């Protein structure tokens, strides 16, 4: 069989206890969820659900095309304008998911010849972005700006450091001020995934980047 190896790999994963099973939630399930990313409880907020329903009635159930062709609506541009203003950026770009945003950011900012220094605790989407980018990825010890400096030292070409602001698995935070200082010292860019900081940290929930000790030129997804 051409794909017989799939069954073999599946059996190995089963024996190792790595098989995961989906557990669908029923409508009306009591909203006690200790594993959710919905920190602020906005997913069920009446204004959010009504806004989503109103948008569906106005624009339909899908974009009907890619953003570059026919898929961009006034809602997209309005949201991007408001997000940029809220976060203090010149502009914002909304993608379909955080995973897509990280792949887009890393691959766009790490062309051929770029040294990519990725934190060992980064989310899988950042790791995949590093793998897909045309630069050369090097993993640095978790939350260790000195390790980032060491990885950047001696590289003459373009370089970028990639890190979560708040790491989703352990819940600890990157040392942003020192990380930004290391990047400035070596002329490297800094890409931050603030998915778990935006709305929770910073002035008015504007994200980890807005903390007084961590201001730095960044790209946040």
Identify the residue ranges that each predicted region occupies.
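N-terminal "arm"/small-domain region of PLP-dependent enzymes with the aminotransferase-like
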Residues: 2-61, 188, 220
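Conserved PLP-anchoring active-site segment centered on the Schiff-base-forming lysine
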Residues: 105-124, 145
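Conserved active-site segment immediately N-terminal to the catalytic lysine
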Residues: 187, 196-198, 205-221
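Active-site phosphate-binding strand-loop segment of PLP-dependent enzymes
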Residues: 138, 142-192
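Conserved N-terminal alpha-helix of the aminotransferase class I/II PLP-enzyme fold
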Residues: 50, 58-97
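Substrate-binding/gating loop at the entrance of the active-site cleft, primarily
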Residues: 96-99, 117-133
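Short, structured coil segments at secondary-structure junctions
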Residues: 112, 132-134, 186, 216-217
């Amino acid at each position: 069989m051409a794909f017989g190896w799939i069954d073999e790999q599946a059996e190995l994963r089963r024996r190792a206890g790595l098989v995961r099973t989906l557990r669908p939630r029923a409508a009306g399930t009591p909203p006690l969820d200790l594993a959710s990313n919905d920190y602020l409880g906005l997913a069920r907020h009446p204004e959010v659900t009504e806004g989503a329903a109103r948008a569906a009635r106005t624009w339909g159930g899908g974009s009907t095309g890619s953003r570059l062709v026919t898929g961009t609506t006034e809602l997209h541009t309005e949201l991007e304008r408001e997000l940029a203003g809220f976060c203090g950026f010149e502009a914002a770009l909304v993608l379909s998911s955080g995973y897509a945003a990280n792949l887009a950011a890393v691959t766009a900012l790490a062309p051929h010849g770029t040294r990519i220094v990725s934190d060992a605790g980064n989310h899988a989407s950042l790791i995949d972005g590093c793998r897909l980018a045309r630069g050369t990825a090097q993993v640095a010890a978790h939350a260790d700006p000195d390790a980032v400096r060491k990885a950047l030292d001696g590289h003459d070409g373009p370089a970028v450091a990639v890190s979560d602001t708040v790491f989703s698995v352990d819940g600890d935070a990157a040392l942003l001020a020192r990380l930004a200082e290391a990047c400035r010292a070596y002329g490297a860019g800094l890409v931050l995934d603030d998915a778990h900081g935006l709305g929770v940290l910073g002035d008015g929930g504007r994200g980890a980047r807005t903390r007084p000790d961590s201001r730095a030129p960044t790209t946040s997804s």
